[in-house]
């Protein structure tokens, strides 16, 4: 496998401080918008907000910077001083440490700080405790306001800091350069800005963390230097401790959170650090091993090596250390993407008032709630993968044989309260007697404490997490009996509630109540086997290889080695370009909208009769046939492309960026991205641990320090080997830029000096850039040299991919969506006897069962039936896509892919297909959905919720999430969405004798099924991705939103549809009514679309619901609903006195000599058998012969 050579790119960045404190009067306009985007708990005056140009930073804000991180002695006598600079970029979050109370809290949930403190103690993580001496030197927000002339009661102060030095601020290793403050303009308001510099500036050649920053007599302070007052603000330090360091500590399994902060800060200051950064006295979680193996974490009779769990604990801490070092490298990266600018947001275009803009932002954030819910409720989510398990050596007889998969991440959320053990496996004092929960089979409930741990015990992030969970569906349309919040709150006044966070008046918004409402979706950890990681990421490129056949016949495969062609010429002959031409031509015909593949174009005005249907289908077929023929001719004759081999190598592929500014403008979404990246880094590091351990004395006290650099180097060597692509940058200072810094002798209130000299310490660095995710198009059997286990796994998959021989129902075939949508126009007389409503289910069911009276069919009807049947049968004969088209876009792309598969002699197995589940939002569908936002609680809860619903437009945050599925991913990916998907990273060596470790990021599944996302379906032939579009939100225009649905109800309804029959609509309605009862009336058209993926049936359901309400005089009655359904069923079941019936089974049979139905005078081609040419041209001919010599298309 060849990789691209690493090329260095020179990029110039301006010098600057490591951060700024922004101080401003609380803005009168836009504060509601800022509150929506921020994370704040109601019991704290602090918040975390996104870095947004025009909202929190000024226009022209420079995100990349060469940070002044220290000083060096220069000159012959070492008397001169120059500055040391390190590249970095500003964090995508800003930290409000004074005036946060002016921002509305993210949730009304009470006492989240108390919950986080309790959870922190319960799981053994350290709390933030400033030293007593530090408190004497605090720089308060009030003092800063007084100095800047701001009213402390109306001021807003927040820290904007570079990514690599957040921890340095947290441990008081910085100071405010008060003399360097200036003013900028944000949103038309004047804002003060105070630069923040590191204390190491006053300690030449000191590249470490300062343990005692308030010691003004430190021996490393330069001679005659005026040491400044370190910047210590208790609310800010606690906020950084909880929101920045806490999540990293949870992900890296380090209970000493302060040690994580110091380790990260040290890596930022010391560019030459190689050894271990995490402390030697780190503790580990004791848990019982999965699958009957020996206990991990605890002692097992004093055994050493793998049997005693020692290597598992060693791999755990070393992988965490390597991940922290890798995150430090990424924090020093320089990115191309500028920070998001609120004035350029498409969702705010045309919104003239602040309230309208806030409403638009609230609707968008509700979209993201679907992705947040998936990350919380998926059992293989990166949020839960916090422990390391040991599968044992690959060869029990030879422990030195390396294995990439020996150590792996497992869900640890439910075992976090287990006893803590030390390096040797002894239980740490204070944890004796604690029960040990098993990795698998535990009975623990997912509780508020677990949710707090997922957020790093940060009340602000926990509040934002609840903001999203309050907008998630807990089962209101899924057949589950979702909790009635009104009744629960009312009953709780007379019963004991196991919650000490809320009172009767605040119970409706309590974290416990929200989790109770979502209880049916809680993660259930039933497996601890090695598997995929559920990751949150962002597509930052409009390009992806997500067409039906992926990157088949791609540019790189067609490019000639001599470079004699232009890129444009090559691109015109790719499969991708062919699909674009097909879609463009269909868009010209007004059949499709390329930007919204699920849209029906203008078909409603085009298909007004049966002739128009013929025209549409024939046009689609001819356009595709022409492009496929031209494509294959170019590939075979023009380029001698190995088109069959190319199909076997084709992949669906996309890239997830590591650029922090590409993520959504929300601190919690940024947390999900960070935790996902840390899980990926640890997965890569764990794969190399066994190779580092092999043949070494791992019990040695100095082993970690000695071999941590080896592990780190091995992980770095995995860059650009198939999965984690990196970019090598040479960083230089901007031309002509003066290095301004505080005077080292005049004090921190003196103006900045610009006479300093300095240079960049890290000149050339390789920065990870993106993660490459792919999925093979074809189902590939096990190779000849595969292991027996691999062959067994492949054998178990074959049945899932095997194409069945059964004939597919016409309505479930390629034209089913058109036949249902336009049945009245195609067959106006296709209605049950006694009914005035044309019914496609009744018509096609009676037709295919040979029960339709022949007298009901005209000659034109019969011609159309012949046309539809022939196309459906011929399409089915070559179809290897396990999905029926839902629109013309899918019909064209599926038909095109199947034609190419036919050319390539593909047979037997379905191919892998992709489905995007697009997150959408809507206003609350019921009063219950708005309960958590009610201004009144207790006895007035229902009245408060109804009042909110009556004036819902006045509440910008009153939106809930919904979903829609789309099987054509390229336009979805072109919207550069935030995504959630499963990722399984394969590792393997290259050619024989090559020790390079290559990787493949395989597109996998989220575990947890419909708990993770209601539209997830267990189908091995399909790969799913949850997507929340960013670029203009173009996919939302399809309006195909959907509510959630549960496995039992979903599969039941889909089963009814797949069985067919005349009474499909009434059967679906009856099943839904019996499952949901009165909640059926709450289902909107988008909910039915999500449940059924059938627009015609969805409209039928809405009509039946309306008739049921009308029958009940406006009130819902289950009896009335069932009565309406049975009447509809009776109507379509009537066939009357049929007389002679139309024999659909024999019609269009394969006997070439059969006389067409209707007698000898009937037109021949329309009624010919399957083997007869259709209009003189059979588009479904035989496959290509074996290759003999040079191929031409005519030979195919």
Swiss-Prot record:
GO terms for biological process: DNA double-strand break processing involved in repair via single-strand annealing; DNA replication. A zinc finger (unnamed) spans 499-512. GO terms for cellular component: host cell nucleus. Belongs to the herpesviridae major DNA-binding protein family. Residues 1174-1196 have a biased composition (Basic and acidic residues). It is found in: Host nucleus. Plays several crucial roles in viral infection. Participates in the opening of the viral DNA origin to initiate replication by interacting with the origin-binding protein. May disrupt loops, hairpins and other secondary structures present on ssDNA to reduce and eliminate pausing of viral DNA polymerase at specific sites during elongation. Promotes viral DNA recombination by performing strand-transfer, characterized by the ability to transfer a DNA strand from a linear duplex to a complementary single-stranded DNA circle. Can also catalyze the renaturation of complementary single strands. The keyword rRNA-binding does not apply. Transmembrane segments: none annotated. Its main location: host cell. Homooligomers. Forms double-helical filaments necessary for the formation of replication compartments within the host nucleus. Interacts with the origin-binding protein. Interacts with the helicase primase complex; this interaction stimulates primer synthesis activity of the helicase-primase complex. Interacts with the DNA polymerase. Interacts with the alkaline exonuclease; this interaction increases its nuclease processivity. A motif (Required for filament formation) lies at residues 843-844, 1142-1144. GO terms for molecular function: single-stranded DNA binding; zinc ion binding. Keywords: DNA replication, DNA-binding, Host nucleus, Metal-binding, Zinc, Zinc-finger. Residues 1158-1196 are annotated as: Disordered. Residues 1170-1196 are annotated as: Required for nuclear localization. Pfam families: Viral_DNA_bp. The keyword DNA-binding applies. It comes from Human herpesvirus 1 (strain KOS) (HHV-1). This is Major DNA-binding protein.
